[in-house]
């Protein structure tokens, strides 16, 4: 009984501390960097484009590098043009009995700020500097992999998602032939549709027109709602 109470206390304390970090990190910088003459956000939900696009939104769970759920729900959005390009990749994969699985898409700026504050200093190359904003904040970056449509399982890759090691590099030469072939297949298909792979993360791709959009901090439940005049 005492052990269970201690576990609940530690869990509750960790969650409370995490919420405090989130609050303080946002207050430390009141909002995202302001940019002029940017296109209005046109974020669309990926699963509404095609029901066979699979979600594995670990930031809505605790099995991510923060150890806490930072999203209130498992949803994924991209700017419309990027989403259409992604759908074309998905349709090409379906011919081989495969499909895209999404780890993350549009990310509110305050979450980028949180990541920056909680990650270790020597691992900050894997997260975006909130002072500059992330392409995820613009709705033009996506973290993804490939899954087998029949089994629902992820196909082998050289590393797991959000693994902060050299194995995460898109040019990593280790691992098995199958893992590297799968990784390179994903990269080839994504680059053919206007995406560029992140040099540190094989799963992270940026869409070509990301500079057209501002750095947003729109909560998921506010996406698509127009402001009243």
Q: What kind of feature is each model-predicted range?
A:
Residues 28-105, 118-200, 209-229:
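Extracytoplasmic cell-surface/polysaccharide-interacting catalytic and binding patches
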Residues 9-12, 208:
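Alpha-helical and His/Cys-centered functional microenvironments
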Residues 108:
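Segments that shape or occlude catalytic/ligand-binding pockets
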Residues 111:
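Short, well-ordered surface patches within globular domains
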Residues 1-8:
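N-terminal secretory signal peptides that target proteins for export/translocation
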Residues 12-24:
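Bacterial N-terminal signal peptides
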Residues 205:
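Conserved metal-phosphate-binding beta-hairpin within the catalytic cores
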